[in-house]
Amino acid sequence: MFHWFVFSRYPLINKQTISYESQNNISSQCDVVIKKDTIRLIVNHLESFRLMKEDLQLDTLSVSHFKQSTLNQKLHAASQLRQEQAKAVKAAINQSPHPVVAVGDFNSIPLSYVYGKIRWGMRDCFLEGSFGKLGNTYKKGPLGIRIDYILCSRTLTPITCEVDRVSYSDHFPVCATIGW
């Protein structure tokens, strides 16, 4: 089970988990009180593919039907769970009485249903604040992909957004400055 920790110099209130089906993943929300304003923060770690090293070492000429079928089942099951999780996260965003900042590992690329569902009606801080920089956040494999996001309500303004190239994990952290 994953847990989130939010560190803030501002008071955090109304902390709760967003309910959805998952074996190990979680989304949580809390309200951040900044002077007389309140912003809803939604932190996410959506379903991963749970691929093992051997799953990624496929020689297409010699892959057995069983192995290919097993891999397809893993990909499909994780994708289905993420779609349902995205619906729950979007419902939480829509129900918020405050502007929202939604962050985290969506385990989905920008062209995916999951990203599109959660982003609908929101601003992608990377697209608006990165000034054309590369945005890969997941560093395994030969090509980096962007699966970690900072999104905000349209009433908020992304000012800057950067991917920090530090090696703390298999993901690079994403940092944004958001105005209101």
Segments (PLM) and residue ranges:
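Metal-dependent phosphoester-hydrolase catalytic domains
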Residues: 84, 91-100, 106-180
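Active-site metal-binding loops of divalent metal-dependent hydrolases
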Residues: 46, 105-106
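Structured beta-strand-rich core segments of catalytic domains in phosphoester-bond hydrolases
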Residues: 1-54, 162-165
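N-terminal post-signal-peptidase region of extra-cytosolic proteins
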Residues: 15-18, 23-28, 87, 131-140
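Soluble or luminal CAZymes and related metallo-dependent hydrolases
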Residues: 20-22, 74-88
